[in-house]
Amino acid sequence: MAPSKWDDEEESTSPPPVAYRRKFDDEEEEDVLDSWDAAEDSEVEREKAAKAAEAKAKAEAEAAAKKKSKAQRIQEHKEERKKREEEDSSSESEEDEAERRARLRRTEKDSDLKHAEDLFGDIDLNRTRNRGAPKAVVVSDSADPTQAVDLSAMPLFKPTTKDQFTRLTTTLAPLLTAHSKKPQYALWAQEFTKQLVKELNSGDVKKIASALTTMSNEKMREERAADKGNKKSKAAKTKVSLVTSRENKIDASYDDDDGLDDDDFM
């Protein structure tokens, strides 16, 4: 019976193995998945933050550009124009004088248009520029129709500066005012003035009307002074004529009266 006792003790001291859940393995796998998700989320957040920072910097730069004064923008355009001219001159040193002047005019015109767009915003400058462009005005000789001149192509009729407008005035005014004594001149001048101010705004038209009113008042004063002078001269002439006539009448009466009556001879 002894062996059976040892067998019982051996069986009692060796309990059957218990199957444990792999808790740590499962938890480690879940932790790895969570860390991957967190890494992806952080990468997305970093991209969003970078985009937001870039957009903010761009907005701040645009706001700073808008806050620049007019003088600063003009100075920047001048510097840009000068830099572009220097680059063009270095790259096109072999061009002749006429080509260089034409290029400089184009460069200056483009810079001025860019400057205007910067100052005035979304105004349709192309539409405004085309509207202000002069149409072809061709004058032909009735005796020889083949002889024609396009006035709009002449530099005189393309003024841009104050001196050029003054030259245009001094050229045209004598040609037009030479007909001021003709009966239809005043009516033509009214219609001509309307056409001249047709494209101006109301403020500029008001200034021109005020200048014409001032000229009208000056003309009235001159005419009144001239009429007054004529009346004084006429009155003086009339007075002298009356005095002369009276003196002649008095002298005639003395000549007829010798101081003797007819009875003195009796």
Curated annotation (Swiss-Prot):
The keyword Cytoplasm applies. InterPro entries: eIF3-like_dom_sf, eIF3j. Transmembrane segments: none annotated. It is found in: Cytoplasm. Residues 1-142, 215-243 are annotated as: Disordered. The keyword Cytoplasm applies. Its main location: cytoplasm. GO terms for cellular component: eukaryotic 43S preinitiation complex; eukaryotic 48S preinitiation complex; eukaryotic translation initiation factor 3 complex. Residues 40-99 form a coiled coil. Residues 26-44, 87-97 have a biased composition (Acidic residues). Residues 45-65, 73-86, 98-118, 218-230 have a biased composition (Basic and acidic residues). It comes from the Eukaryota. GO terms for molecular function: translation initiation factor activity. Keywords: Coiled coil, Cytoplasm, Initiation factor, Protein biosynthesis. Component of the eukaryotic translation initiation factor 3 (eIF-3) complex. Belongs to the eIF-3 subunit J family. PANTHER family: EUKARYOTIC TRANSLATION INITIATION FACTOR 3 SUBUNIT J. Component of the eukaryotic translation initiation factor 3 (eIF-3) complex, which is involved in protein synthesis of a specialized repertoire of mRNAs and, together with other initiation factors, stimulates binding of mRNA and methionyl-tRNAi to the 40S ribosome. The eIF-3 complex specifically targets and initiates translation of a subset of mRNAs involved in cell proliferation. This is Eukaryotic translation initiation factor 3 subunit J. The lineage of its organism: Eukaryota, Fungi, Dikarya, Ascomycota, Pezizomycotina.
